[in-house]
């Protein structure tokens, strides 16, 4: 039985959160990954931007793990017919030391 989009995304988001935390400097307590689909839509790769509001001058490039996770997200979205044009994926460290994440999608209406 095929997994739902939410089940696919849940697994991918966990991989992506771990990869994003690993890619950022240890002094960052939050990070944002912006993914933008090309004008032709999903399937042709995504533009990636990683940033921190606390450290706007720091430069972080996507690792292989981030690229693999975002490609998996793109392919899962295509497989389930979920056409989005932009995704902002945020991770933040809680006072307990644990990391939480949230993903927000922009879709054409």
Give the label of every model feature segment.
Residues 1-109:
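Contiguous interface-forming segments/domains that mediate binding rather than catalysis
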């Amino acid at each position: 039985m095929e997994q739902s989009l939410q089940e696919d995304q849940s697994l991918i988001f966990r991989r992506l959160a771990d990869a994003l935390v690993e890619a950022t400097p240890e002094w960052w307590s939050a990070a944002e990954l912006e993914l933008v689909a090309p004008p032709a839509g999903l399937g042709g790769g995504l533009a990636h931007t990683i940033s921190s509001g606390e450290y706007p001058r720091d430069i972080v490039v996507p690792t292989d793990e981030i690229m693999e996770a975002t490609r998996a997200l793109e392919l899962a979205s295509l497989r389930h017919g979920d056409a989005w044009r932009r995704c902002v994926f945020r991770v933040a460290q809680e006072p307990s030391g644990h990391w939480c994440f949230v993903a927000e999608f922009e879709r054409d209406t």
